[in-house]
Amino acid sequence: MRRELVYLSSIGEDCCEAARAFGLGIELAQFCTAARLDGAPPEPWELPVERCLSASSRFVLHGPFNELTPAAIDPLVLDVTKKRYRQAIKKAHTMGIQKIVLHAGFLPLVYYPEWFVERSAAVWRELLCAIPDDMTVCLENVLEPEPQLLTAIMEAVHDPRLRICLDLGHANTCASALPPENWLRVCAPYLSHVHLHNNQGDRDLHAALFDGVMDIAGLLSLLEALSPQATCTLELTQDRPSLDWLVEKHLLE
């Protein structure tokens, strides 16, 4: 991975120090909680946004996701979803950030896939009308069982400002019907961003890159072959051990 394409999530306790030491960007996760967009005070465990802004010159913003989905059947829930997405996009634009990550929002056993794709496409056609040409919204997989749910939205909307954030850790849990490498191959034509962490193949652990069953080195090689310009965020609670591992394995240029 080229360092200019690599980011560290602000969930990492040492992300600011590691970003400075390795010359990496930061993905701001402070706005994952929607109340922060309304001016609510940060949680005690959060890294201050200002501290993150002083540690790097490159940023991605991760928007809110709790109880939000563009496939909502209740019109009031749908209104809240669109409001929160608009707030997050405005926040990113105000901060001069051109890439924003939002969860795609599929709920298994709640939405039919066809409904989810149709409703998501309609919402994103509406929201993209107010998004600058130089901004990219990346939809992230969480509980989606297969990548075609995301690529179908991309095909329906057909707008370069809407792309995929492939969370490889989420693709390696019990929610996924396919292994991560299959997700990567299917998503590649629409891939703009990747979330990287490891686990044991069942639950979402956000474990170190070397602590799990995923072949991180192999996935990074495949990513380089399929989507060499995609950016990548390490979503870890501790960054330095995984960064040292990447350097040791000659995976970070």
Regions found by a protein language model. Name each.
Residues 35-36, 67-73, 107-112, 173-175, ...:
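A short acidic, helix-capping loop that chelates divalent metal ions and anchors anionic groups
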Residues 48-66, 121-133, 216-223:
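Alpha-helix-loop-beta-strand connector modules within alpha/beta enzyme cores
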